[in-house]
Structures are given as C-alpha cells and as structure tokens.
C-alpha cells in the first residue's frame, strides 16, 4: 500500500498472478493534462469500480456510463404505411382528461405504421430491442402480437430497400378499456443494411393479426 503524510492508506496495490496488463501514468508539459493509459496487450480495458451505491464523478458531476439506452417514439411521431395502414385517431377518455394519440390496429388483418430515426453517434450499430405501449379498445383478454423490423440507409444508398427480419412480442389484453399496457422487452432486432454513423434507420411496426397466435378480438391502440 501507499500511505499519505499522516500514515493512512492512500492507495492499495493488489497483485494478479501472471499479470501482463497494467496502468501507465505519464506527466505532461505546460498546457497538457497527465495521461493514465492501459498498457500491455493490444486491446485493454480500464475498469473503475465504485463501491456500493457510489458513482464515478468528473469534478462534481457523475459520469454517464455507456450501456443500454432508451428512446421514446410515440404514435404521434409515426405515420401509416401507404399499403395496409393502421388508422390514426385521437381518443378522448373523459373531457379535459388525457386524450390519446393512437394508431388503431384491427383484429382482421395486419396493419402497419412506419417511422425513422437518426441514431446518436454513440450507438454501437448493433441489435436493438423494443417494448410496445398500447391500450385495448375492448375487455377481451386474448393475446395481441406486435412486430418491428428496420433497415438503415446511408448517404447515396437507395431508400427503396427491404426491411430486415421482423421480431414479435406477445401481450395479453388486460381486460379493461383505456388501461395502459406495456409489453415485455422483445428479443434482439437485427437492422438490415449496414448500420453506421450518420445513417437514417427506417422502422416498420405492425400488429401480426393474421397469425394464429393473435387472439385479441378488439382494436389494439398503439400509444
């Protein structure tokens, strides 16, 4: 251990058997900051592990940790597909209480909506997951199956391109009209194309109403 001027522990050093990776601390000249580097093998992480509920801080602010990010896309930001569109609607609950901007998905056949996103540059261009926020139009408790598929398009690419493989998620009707419903998190959705920075990603969202497992008999309202 390294002790401070009062004899208290300042830094504890723990040995690892057969270690090959280490930290290198370099000082700096005027106008430059010191550098803490991982050295050893070709690709080496630096692991900083706070204790308990502690967080990493820069100056006095907590450092944002990269990981799973969420993005809210409401029905009002979507548009009905030209072919087999879901029906856009504004549904009043009670006067001067929340109105719902929704897309209505019928039980008889597949309906579709679309939207697009230019993801933040911090996105790793990997798979995504999703949850559907919806509300039932009836008290039926059958299973409603939602689906999502996507494709990324870059500068100079054609937008006339097929969506990737759809991934579905199933949610049973809650049995109460106008109750909020949130599906489970879907499995991974692979976006078609070659996702990269500065691309626009198009999504198609639908109700898989004509598949045998969709037994919800009412209109499913996507929020």
Predicted regions and their residues:
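Short carbohydrate-recognition loop motifs
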Residues: 93-108
């Amino acid at each position: 251990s390294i002790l401070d001027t009062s004899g208290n522990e300042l830094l504890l050093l723990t040995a690892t058997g057969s270690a090959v990776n280490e930290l290198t601390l370099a000082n700096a000249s005027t106008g430059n900051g010191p550098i803490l580097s991982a050295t050893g093998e070709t690709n080496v992480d630096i692991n900083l592990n706070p204790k308990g509920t502690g967080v990493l801080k820069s100056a006095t602010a907590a450092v944002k940790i990269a990981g799973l990010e969420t993005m809210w896309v409401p029905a009002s930001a979507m548009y009905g597909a030209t072919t087999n569109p879901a029906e856009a609607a504004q549904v009043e609950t009670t006067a001067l209480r929340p109105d719902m901007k929704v897309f209505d998905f019928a039980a008889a056949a597949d309906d579709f909506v679309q939207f697009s996103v230019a993801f933040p540059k911090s996105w790793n261009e990997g798979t995504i997951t999703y949850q559907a926020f919806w509300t039932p139009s009836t008290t039926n408790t059958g299973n409603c199956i939602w689906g999502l598929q996507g494709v990324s398009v870059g500068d100079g690419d054609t937008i006339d391109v097929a969506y990737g493989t759809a991934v579905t998620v199933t949610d049973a009707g809650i049995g109460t009209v106008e109750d909020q419903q949130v599906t489970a998190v879907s499995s991974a959705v692979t976006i078609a194309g070659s996702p990269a920075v500065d691309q626009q990603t198009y999504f198609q969202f639908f109700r898989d109403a004509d598949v045998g497992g969709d037994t919800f008999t009412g209109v499913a309202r996507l929020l």
